[in-house]
Amino acid sequence: MFPKSNLTVTCWVWRSMRKLFLLLSLLLSHAAHLEGKKDNQFIWKPGPWGRCTGDCGPGGVQSRAVWCFHVDGWTSHLSNCGESNRPPKERSCFRVCDWHSDLFQWEVSDWHHCVLVPYARGEVKPRTAECVTAQHGLQHRMVRCIQKLNRTVVANEICEHFALQPPTEQACLIPCPRDCVVSEFLPWSNCSKGCGKKLQHRTRAVIAPPLFGGLQCPNLTESRACDAPISCPLGEEEYTFSLKVGPWSKCRLPHLKEINPSGRTVLDFNSDSNERVTFKHQSYKAHHHSKSWAIEIGYQTRQVSCTRSDGQNAMLSLCLQDSFPLTVQSCIMPKDCETSQWSSWSPCSKTCRSGSLLPGFRSRSRNVKHMAIGGGKECPELLEKEACIVEGELLQQCPRYSWRTSEWKECQVSLLLEQQDPHWHVTGPVCGGGIQTREVYCAQSVPAAAALRAKEVSRPVEKALCVGPAPLPSQLCNIPCSTDCIVSSWSAWGLCIHENCHDPQGKKGFRTRQRHVLMESTGPAGHCPHLVESVPCEDPMCYRWLASEGICFPDHGKCGLGHRILKAVCQNDRGEDVSGSLCPVPPPPERKSCEIPCRMDCVLSEWTEWSSCSQSCSNKNSDGKQTRSRTILALAGEGGKPCPPSQALQEHRLCNDHSCMQLHWETSPWGPCSEDTLVTALNATIGWNGEATCGVGIQTRRVFCVKSHVGQVMTKRCPDSTRPETVRPCFLPCKKDCIVTAFSEWTPCPRMCQAGNATVKQSRYRIIIQEAANGGQECPDTLYEERECEDVSLCPVYRWKPQKWSPCILVPESVWQGITGSSEACGKGLQTRAVSCISDDNRSAEMMECLKQTNGMPLLVQECTVPCREDCTFTAWSKFTPCSTNCEATKSRRRQLTGKSRKKEKCQDSDLYPLVETELCPCDEFISQPYGNWSDCILPEGRREPHRGLRVQADSKECGEGLRFRAVACSDKNGRPVDPSFCSSSGYIQEKCVIPCPFDCKLSDWSSWGSCSSSCGIGVRIRSKWLKEKPYNGGRPCPKLDLKNQVHEAVPCYSECNQYSWVVEHWSSCKINNELRSLRCGGGTQSRKIRCVNTADGEGGAVDSNLCNQDEIPPETQSCSLMCPNECVMSEWGLWSKCPQSCDPHTMQRRTRHLLRPSLNSRTCAEDSQVQPCLLNENCFQFQYNLTEWSTCQLSENAPCGQGVRTRLLSCVCSDGKPVSMDQCEQHNLEKPQRMSIPCLVECVVNCQLSGWTAWTECSQTCGHGGRMSRTRFIIMPTQGEGRPCPTELTQEKTCPVTPCYSWVLGNWSACKLEGGDCGEGVQIRSLSCMVHSGSISHAAGRVEDALCGEMPFQDSILKQLCSVPCPGDCHLTEWSEWSTCELTCIDGRSFETVGRQSRSRTFIIQSFENQDSCPQQVLETRPCTGGKCYHYTWKASLWNNNERTVWCQRSDGVNVTGGCSPQARPAAIRQCIPACRKPFSYCTQGGVCGCEKGYTEIMKSNGFLDYCMKVPGSEDKKADVKNLSGKNRPVNSKIHDIFKGWSLQPLDPDGRVKIWVYGVSGGAFLIMIFLIFTSYLVCKKPKPHQSTPPQQKPLTLAYDGDLDM
């Protein structure tokens, strides 16, 4: 019991343990899963890449943020994600800058062909099954970002910075699938010849290939057995036999096993073993260097068999007749081309870092050691290239190149004037517009930091390294013209004053006069005259008392003695009031005695003002004088005080008593700015070279005293106060050292050896980019250096050295005897020779050297013949006979028969074995013929200025006599082209030509300025030019001319209106107009003298009276009156008071006078005051400045163009329109305009500046006729102003010399040579000839020596190919069919593409059904074509015949084809009814349904099929009465019967149901009966009495009802 219980417990424990283990494993796996799940709960998520920062180009850096994410989407600490798979945060990038848009662009290729869209997933049937017109497709194209400069591909992100990427695919349509279209079968061929089984065949050709998934072409051949095989007659075999030769085996050497002890050789026709045994008597060693290279001669065999016309083999004896074909021949053991080992890789072409992403390249090469022979493998490529990338930060940046320029050279006016007048010569200082030039060169760009560290300036390099347009080498410039100051007139002489009023000394002083500058001088040579003149004087006074007198007041009573009040002020020499303490002591008295006349006293007027001085200066002969006077107003009465004598009525005094010799200071021009030690030490700036550069200096000049009309005098004679400065500060010009570029690199010496003994030199140069100035370091003398290249070796000349030919090597004797059984060794063989390459000093060289310098390697092997006993033998050919000078002569050579051949009849046949060969002698007569058009007229080249870069007008020829050329085609007597040097030394015929010279418009010189058009005020001065010659032939055009062919310039001018004015003297005494002269009072007259004076000099010298204005001449006489003693005497009227500036008419003007003597009878005196209104232009005047228009732009006399000045003049005009003195406007303090001159620019007349002609380009063709070469020139400076326009001819062309073309021409393939067989494998050969032609190979090409064509471009395999001639019974391919017409792919009649297709095909011909399994496949060939047409295909059908007709497909041009038409739309060719018409009297109709015969009607079932044919009643009677109805029963068209057969009035249909028309007729009859009944009722009914009611009145409405109206 216990054991059982223990067992139970054990089982239970074991089961419990199993469950526990299972639970633990589940828990562990779950924990591992959770742990793994925990590891997979966090993932890295990178953000988008940021912008590329850093330098422009490939050195940029791009960064992005990287986060650690939980799978639920929330971010976590970075430590939760694994560091190993963390995405990168930074990467290098190409930073795109805006200027990159000029360097990169999208390059888009053409759209590729439209291809079908791939089938959708799960779609089984092709989409083309439902195609109607076209099917959907896709077109792709290549879009890439490229660098414009070298068309290299870069990252697309660069171009995306500027423009979106163009699409790379688009939808398109593909035409529906088009099956292969073939022509109709040709007629059956004739039955094969012979008796027995005969076959005939027919073929067809492909017209259009299958396209767009269409069906492939069907078989193009059909064969069938002839119907009636002809039995062979007795004695004639059923089959024909042909000798079939097989292909030659590979060339091999004899095996040891082929030779047995008996000397017999067992031939192995099929052996292609590579095992070789070299027999010494069968090989010839060709020594090359120290290593032997044997050319081995082996043999090759072929099989010969007899084949029957049905393709079966037959006994060989049935085919052999006269001779047995050759089955073994000598051959060359093939040897492959042998090359040397590859050289080491060259350094990578990219050796620096640049912005280009294009990799570099490196290459390696190998040489040919032995050429391939015997059909061995040709030489492989001898040069190998591959891309390479050199990486690393230590790699230096690639140099960048940019255009650099020197400073502009000095402006040269001569360059401009030479254009206008080639014979112009400098006659004085020139200024104005000119041309300045500079050097333009290409140099390596240096970073700014490096440029600061390095003192060496840039080095010029080749200009081809710089891209982009070069800076202009010349430009217009301007030399400022110098103009002198414009000054005003001299002022009046001042008072005599001390030289220094602050420290007066001595009794001598100076009187001065001034003038001021109206317009400053311009330019470096502009000069101002002296502005102050002085004269010495006595008793100088700097300050003076100026007293004004009042009227006389009586001291007692009303007359008698009295006094005047004096008012004195102290004034300086300028008339300004100053303190009285400055004037001399004592001051003038305040009172002055005077006398008032009593009633009977004589009355005198007041003294007049002192007149102007009679002279401007005094000399020994005369002095200047001034006068004043007074007049008698009333005579004295009885007892009164008498009048003074006439002498007492005038007073005189001296004036301008100074000498006429004026003194003034003169100055020399300012000297150059020089250093002042003290000033320079304080202001200098120190440059990097430690020398003083710029600062402040001083300028000095000499000052000396000049006496007018005498010259220089002692300086103390001139007042020191007006002495000009002799020293002034100036800016020191910076010292400019000459700066030159570094020398360019030496031009490279040739790495390759040089032919001949010519001296090769290399050179370098440097360019002056800054000239020395202001004492700087001068430029070096050497700017160009040249030296001879060292270690330049002469190229050795290599040539081939062939050895003698070896003896003729035949097939091995054992092989030969094994086949023929003859011991005679004769027939065709091969002979070899060694060819080595040697130098000109007979040293061995590599074969590659000779291959480079020669036109190919000489032959190593050639065929030879060992004559047999039966062969004809000859002596060697003699030399050709000498030629005479006659071109008709021939040369010949001879040979003779030798030995027994002289007696053999076949050897006497001169056609087979000619003994004389004749050739035409070379002829030195050549025929020249002009070809092509004449070239442009070409002028000789002109001189070029090396530093200006411009063509010198005087030396360059743009017109005149030149030459034009025409090519010469030279040919020999046979019409073959030869080198043109045989006919002409240059290959051209030339003749003189003339290019008309342009003549510019020529005008005269400027006339002198005319006088001012106005003598007073503002006028115009004019000068003019007139036309001398008109322009023609493209000369400089004329400016705009007037009707008189003149051009004018006008400038304003001004004449001072008071320059010449009338000066009046004092009035004389009044003379009474009384004849008796008894009365001494009353009216009378008085006179005065007038004269015309020039007031411009300030003194008023008398001039001719005609110069003054005659309209303003003052009166010389006037009426006057002397008051009688008893009359009241008044003084003369004083001046009118001033009117306001506005001339207000409400304002009055007043003048007064006072009583001098009362009347005796106490009568009232005349008025003592007068008033008048201020009226404009009567007694009140206004003044204003008047400005002229700007003048034309005025240049200096020596300036042709450039900076000028435009001026305008200022005048003062009265309100009445009359010009007045400028003083009037100045006195009223009117605002003066500021700018009286402005700068202007006269456009320079610049002729078009052209570069020199470039060198002639290479001929557009290497040989032949039709080639052209050209040269061009460029516009350096376009025409400006009225310059000579640029010529339209910037390119010149001429025909190239007609040189002969030499080409290798392959001949046609020969017929297949079987070498004794009737069919089988043979060989075709063709010739390779050197032909000469004039550009196109045609029938006119002639054959010449092979050496003229150079190295042969073809291998032997191109000149020989295997071929086969089918044996009777063999299945073989036909020749190619003709190319079909060009057909386009079209949709709905419109072309789908521009290029069409045409096809041709080859099919097979079966000659025996037994061999049809071995037939080759038919071949289809398609090529593109142009000029195609759209064709459409339609089904055509013939008329029915016994329910059958012919259906075919026809192309739109009428060609019957197979394919092209839709199979679904094919019409039926056989007419049949389903099910068949088996009912009595039924037949199958054209519609394909059963119908009934005539006289029966169809009874149809519900499903539309015929049930039975029911006889039409009465049809028998009509049939029986044939005689009576014969005239009516004419034949009726069965089709018409079928049409109207269904119209019989049968009430039942074939199914027995009532027809619809029966129901219609019944319904219609019922309606008619009801209508008749109703009508009868109305007619019979009694009518009711008629009652009418008045119509109801409707209200009238005026509304318009449009609907009612409508």
UniProtKB/Swiss-Prot annotation:
Residues 1577-1606 are cytoplasmic. Its main location: membrane. Residues 1-31 form the signal peptide. Pfam families: TSP1_ADAMTS (PF19030), TSP1_spondin (PF19028), TSP1_TSH7A-B_C (PF23308), TSP_1 (PF00090). PROSITE patterns: TSP1 (PS50092). GO terms for cellular component: plasma membrane. This is Thrombospondin type-1 domain-containing protein 7B. The gene is THSD7B.
